[in-house]
């Protein structure tokens, strides 16, 4: 039994042929197969041919969904290995933080927007921006998991993402979040530009919203193991579960809660004060 399937997402061509997949029917029964060919240039999405272990004539139908065939999620050495952390971890963190935020006074205006079709170019976010699903005066903290690099390690704490490979995000909101987190002296967090992909904050900023991003460092980005080694032809291309740090995840929930709690509180204008002190001290050099 062979199936022709579309692949909706961003995975490099080398990872497809030979990879195991699991296809689900409408009763959530799974059927194991192997990708035997890839049509990388097919439009609008790549297409693959999957050879199943057994016939499924009349069982699997159009629009049934497949995923890579991995073991169930597990935690080892403080790391969660799961078929999809991007962006289920962000969804889970948003809901967990909202449960905390709802218990705090004065934060009834805080809400969560979940969008669809993020992996094919955040189409849901674009639609939300164009249709003004969110009020234009909203401040948007987009949540992501983003490919880890040596300078943005897994386990180094949740990340205030100042930009992605396409753009930098709203400086006013990013700087406010930075000031808030700098005040948390014992909190482990990172402030990084994460160039491994493009996120919804880019779309929202482009459509005139005030937005920045909080994210988790991600291993095996988009289920691609050893990305750099594969690109350099030093490693075989194999799909693998995505990986995040459990402590980073809990930190993201706390970070989101803290920023929402403190965003409207008065803050010392430390940067402006520093700049004014500097010009007062050295203005004679300009004469």
Regions found by a protein language model. Give the residues of each.
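N-terminal hydrophobic/helix-forming segments and targeting peptides
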Residues: 1-287
């Amino acid at each position: 039994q062979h199936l022709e399937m579309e692949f909706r997402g961003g995975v490099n061509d080398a990872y497809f042929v030979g990879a195991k997949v699991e296809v689900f029917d409408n009763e959530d029964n799974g059927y194991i197969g192997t990708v035997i060919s890839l049509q990388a240039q097919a439009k609008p999405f790549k297409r693959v041919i999957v050879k199943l272990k057994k016939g499924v004539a009349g069982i699997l139908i159009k629009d049934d969904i497949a995923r890579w065939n991995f073991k169930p999620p597990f935690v080892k050495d403080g790391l969660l290995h799961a078929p999809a952390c991007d962006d289920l971890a962000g969804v889970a963190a948003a809901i967990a933080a909202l449960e905390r935020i709802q218990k705090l006074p004065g934060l009834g205006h805080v809400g969560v927007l979940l969008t669809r079709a993020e992996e094919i170019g955040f189409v849901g976010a674009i639609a939300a921006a164009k249709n003004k699903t969110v009020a234009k005066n909203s401040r948007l903290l987009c949540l992501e998991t983003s490919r880890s690099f040596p300078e943005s390690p897994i386990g180094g704490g949740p990340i205030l993402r100042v930009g992605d490979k396409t753009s930098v995000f709203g400086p006013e909101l990013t700087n406010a979040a930075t000031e808030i987190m700098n005040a948390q002296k014992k909190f482990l967090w990172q402030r990084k530009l994460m160039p491994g992909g493009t996120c919804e904050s880019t779309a929202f900023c482009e459509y005139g919203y005030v937005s920045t991003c909080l994210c988790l460092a991600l291993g095996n980005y988009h289920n691609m193991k050893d990305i750099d080694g594969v690109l350099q032809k030093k490693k075989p291309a194999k799909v693998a579960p995505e990986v995040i740090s459990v402590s980073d995840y809990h930190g993201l929930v706390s970070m989101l809660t803290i920023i929402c709690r403190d965003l409207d509180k008065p803050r010392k204008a430390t940067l402006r004060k520093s700049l004014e002190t500097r010009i007062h001290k050295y203005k004679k050099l300009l004469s």
